[in-house]
Amino acid sequence: FPPFSVGEAGRFGFTSRREIGHGALAERSVLPVLPPEDDFPYAIRLVSEVMSSNGSTSMASVCGGSLALMDAGVPLSQHVAGISTGLVTEMDDDGNIAKYVILTDIIGAEDHFGDMDFKLCGTRDGVTGFQLDLKIRGLPFNIAKEAVKQVTEARMKILDVMDACQPAHRKELREHAPRIEMVQIDPEKIGALIGPGGKNIRRITEVTGANIDIDDDNSGKVRVYAKDRDA
């Protein structure tokens, strides 16, 4: 989230509190749809670079991140989308809310002058992450309920567009993506795979460029790590 994305002049080279907070919310929202490690034993680094911002870049990062993961071949259970709602209120003489308007997909000015920034992420089945920032003393239940209903309807529309663009994850990883494969062999054949003094396993590594890791529990599970599909 560089300063120029919001028209500011600032320093580069360190992570800001805004980037940490937005990143944590986006990560928490995407985690529930990631596959278990046994099915997809890869380390995943998801980067969202903001070039221009006028509100809710964390929600854009969730939507863009979900599309990017699907396009990369990560088998997400389903898409995740996020959107924010705002609130503008008018108080009576006693300090109670007399009038209010709930705003969907707020921009920077509506966030600055408004009374609420309610970010909510989820799939078609439920919520995966949310964050509520308020400038008023409290949020009445009826307004909170209306805001959730409004943001849920908006999320479904976003998911419709995302599903039309990328309905499912790619069946295979990109050609040049690192590969991890698990092969089950007869435990009695482990010695033959290793060879005298590790001769066989070293030869395989030299020829293919792949690394081979054999589980220590004598289960016969062999993991092959390669830099790309050809290896």
Say what each PLM segment does:
Residues 1-42, 128-136, 140-145:
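Glycine-rich, flexible beta-strand/loop modules in the N-terminal catalytic cores of phosphate-handling
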Residues 206-217:
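Polar interaction faces of repeat-based domains
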Residues 216-227:
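Short glycine/threonine-rich beta-strand-turn micro-motifs
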Residues 69-171:
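Mobile "lid/hinge" segments at catalytic clefts and subdomain interfaces of large enzymes
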Residues 157-184, 229-231:
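Long, charged amphipathic helices and adjacent flexible linkers at domain junctions
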Residues 10-15, 48-56:
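A short glycine/serine-rich beta->alpha loop
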